[in-house]
Structure formats: structure tokens, C-alpha cells
Amino acid sequence: PVTSITLGDIDKALALEGESQFTTKCAACHKMDKRKIGPPMAGIMSRRSPEWIMNMILNPDEMVKENAQAKALLAEYLSPMANQSLTEPEARQILEYFRQYDNTNN
């Protein structure tokens, strides 16, 4: 599991890659600004830690077994998050996209 992430200034190139990853791997179930099959992602950086987000992207099955917040999301949305088999660098790109989105839209 990801235990520590150091965040600096927003990396726009990394965020652009993350937007592409999100569109390809996540947008079937998630929208940024409203509920779909899964929860909206807007504001995620203020609701969850970067480590939590990375672990949920990388290993949603384990998170739903072990993490109370992930269990609560499953109970609310009734559909487990699919494991997209993303690498840690790909998950980091998505995290950066979330950071940029929240920074721009808040």
C-alpha cells in the first residue's frame, strides 16, 4: 500500500496525463461534478488523504475489506469499484488531475 506521498506544486503535465487516464479508466462510473455509478470526484482532495485516494485507485478490493470509509461508500453506492489494474505512476497522474481540478474549481 501507499503510505506516504509528498505533494509539491501542481504538475500540469502530470495532471493532463491524469485527465486522460480518468477519461479512459474512471469516467464510465465517475463524473467530476455529479453522482454517477460511483461518487463525484470534485472536492475529493478535501475529503480524503492523497494516500487514501492512491490506495483506492490501486487496490479497491482490499480497501473495501479493510477501510471504514471505503466500506461506507460501498454501502451508499451499492457497486464496488472495479480494479482497473493501474500502475502507481498512473494512479499518481489521476491524483494530480484531482488536485488540479479541485484547485481550479474551488
Which residues fall in each region the model found?
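Short pre-active-site segment immediately N-terminal to redox-active cysteine/selenocysteine motifs
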Residues: 14, 22-25, 33, 37, ...
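C-terminal capping alpha-helices of c-type cytochrome domains
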Residues: 51-56, 79-106
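Axial heme c-ligation environment in periplasmic c-type cytochrome domains
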Residues: 37-44, 61-91
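Sequence context of c-type cytochrome heme-c attachment sites
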Residues: 2-5, 31, 71-73, 80
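Short, cysteine/histidine-rich loop/knuckle motifs that typically chelate Zn2+
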Residues: 28
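Electrostatic cytochrome c docking/interface patches
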Residues: 1-21
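Residues at helix-coil transition
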Residues: 23, 31, 58-59, 96-100
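Gly/Gly-Pro-rich "capping" loops immediately C-terminal to redox-active cysteine motifs
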Residues: 15, 19, 31-62
